[in-house]
Amino acid sequence: MTKANFSNSLPLFWGHAQAALHNQIGMAIDVLLGLQWGDEGKGKVVDFLAPNYDIIARFQGGPNAGHTLRIEGKKFVLHTIPSGIFRKELVNLIGNGVVVDPITLVKELDQLSAIGVDYADRLLLARKAHLILPTHRYIDAASEQAKGKEKIGSTLKGIGPTYMDKTGRNGLRVGDLMLPDFHARYEALKEKHLTIAKLYPTIDFDLEAEEQRWMECIETLRSLRQVDCEYYVAEALRRGKRILAEGAQGSMLDIDFGTYPFVTSSNTISAGVCTGLGVAPSAIGEVIGITKAYCTRVGSGPFPTELEDEMGAFLRAEGSEFGATTGRPRRCGWIDLPQLRYTIMLNGVTQLAVTKVDVLNRIREINVATHYHYDGADNDQLPFDLCQTKVTPIYKGYQGWEQSLDDAKVYQDLPVATQSFLGALESALKTPIRMVSIGPEREKLIVKTT
């Protein structure tokens, strides 16, 4: 699908009213984000939709994210750079809401260069994005280790400490790299961190080596094109450019509305686009929510539908469920409708993409959690604190299709049982399913037009 014919297909894909708005003024940012605990397959869907846009923008998170793409049979994992970087016609923007580790970013850039991706004219970096220092990672690791059995499952990438400095008004930003007194500012913040680090037991961390590498990498950041994100996006919208905001992690890891304290340190929901790119709420157009056909979670925290039996192990093996960033095995369970209703509500989701449907190919009966039972009653809402409330999922079983989906090219090619399962999800969630992923490859994504 090319940009030239994209507007003609919009009525099928986004609906008549929104298509008319896009065609008239072009002033909307579409949002794509995960509706579970992350790892929903956002990178693949962004890559699929990318030709319909001019700009792909990350608006929150940092190198704790891991977006996996398979292009021409090869696997690529992006942690900070937007998933549109492989398409030479697109601009990729790292927004002000993202926290940037120069070492991780340069490693990604080196990997792109090694496969012939010329990122120089494709990648923009917001001046107001905050920097992850080596001492942020040191504090993160020391703090997590000190928690013992109470660990929250940090990726140890320095994300939390960096956001703490941001809200505490102590942080360093990308734009600060160009200031003549940057080194003095860096040293002052490092000393604060080292004072904090004394509160924790000593850990194995070669700070001197990490700092040396960090200083080398910031020279690359200085060479990248830096922009005032808010002005850049506003001007792009004024000129009718199409923008897709790419979320990281998942909605259930949102700092305010996720399973606190087992959450990330940023707002992963659609509201984060406004602060993470510097745009007004009225600029938000479509909100595309991504969910797996089952559910996974990495690290600690509540997970109502978790399967700690052979079925859980089967889903993990069949779905290759190991963290793209940490390599940790993911916890697996059945799809959770109360949880999805919650995140659809929070995000204002207008359409759904269901991924990894093929992972269920060999299952005879597929369970779906339709409600919860807690505090002596059935409920379709999440309790205030999933960590402290004993929740029992109430399941409904659906017939599996027990066959490969490889030959399906359009939605109608899917087995009747597959269509029935997806139709039941669509009906229960009261949100249209527009995309169905039946394999890891780029071409294994079906657009549902009716």
PLM feature spans:
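Intrinsic-disorder-associated, low-complexity terminal segments enriched in Asp/Asn/His/Tyr and depleted
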Residues: 5-8, 22-23
